Amino acid sequence: MKKILALFSLGWSLNLMAANDISTMKQTNTQAKKYTNELFLHHTLTKEFSSKINRIKYNLYISLPKGYSSNNKSYPIIYLLDADYSFALAKQISEHLSDRNRINDSIIVGIAYANPNEYKKNRTRDYTPSYVSSGGYGSEYQKYSGGAEAFYRFIYSELIPYLHQTYRVNQNSTFVGHSYGGLFGVYLLIHHPEVFNHYIIVSPSLWYDNHLVLKAAQRKRNFNLQQKTRVCFIIGDHENKGDYRMIDDLKLFNEIIMSKPHKNLSTIFNILNDMDHDTVFPGA
């Protein structure tokens, strides 16, 4: 874990350095009409995908393993939320570890949006399980909240079938979500756990709507699943702040799961040292 954390931290630092370099380059080349050498990610495809279910336009970032075109193998698949910031980091770190035989090659799919400038609106709409008029990013964005069920149906009924028809994907699937994205992952675990068989849930916003999902978990009779499912909960050690007791909330959710019958479901709980809500994702 410490080695992986160090690699993620390095990747995060490089991302910040690159962002600063790009900002400087824009300032010093304001007269240039275009850049002739643009940065791109190898083995990565992009696709616009319009959902018929929630009528939202998504951008998919799809990373294929290096040897994908030269063999007939089927691969595990990883689904990333908040792909506009998570995809490049996860792809580069995964390839680094795969090249050293530390992890298996995987297809990585990042779910992003046609208009990244509407970041707060998009994730408030898609990742939250209920309508709440205030809180979160504020009432300006909360008026779009409560679209988690429609987002689930988009993933389950449209996105997953498309990817399985288009690429050589096996049955090993992983969900990755942070903050509101982690909240959506917990929502899936409670209401639709069959979608994925691995979950990496980082600092989920379990406080949302007066701890709505925690209450739903407490009402659930059991967490018995049809397929073996493994969940990794990750949170920073600086995430109990003021009214937001995010470490306590996540510990409670894990305890609720483990206190009920939970056939085929196992969990891992990690608290990362010297991490807060903003810095924990690269270390996850």
Predicted regions and their residues:
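Gly/Ala-rich beta-loop-alpha elbow adjacent to hydrolase catalytic centers
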Residues: G177-G181, G185
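Alpha/beta-hydrolase fold nucleophile elbow
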Residues: Y167-H178, Y199
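A domain-start/cap signature at the N-terminus of enzymes
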Residues: A18-Y75
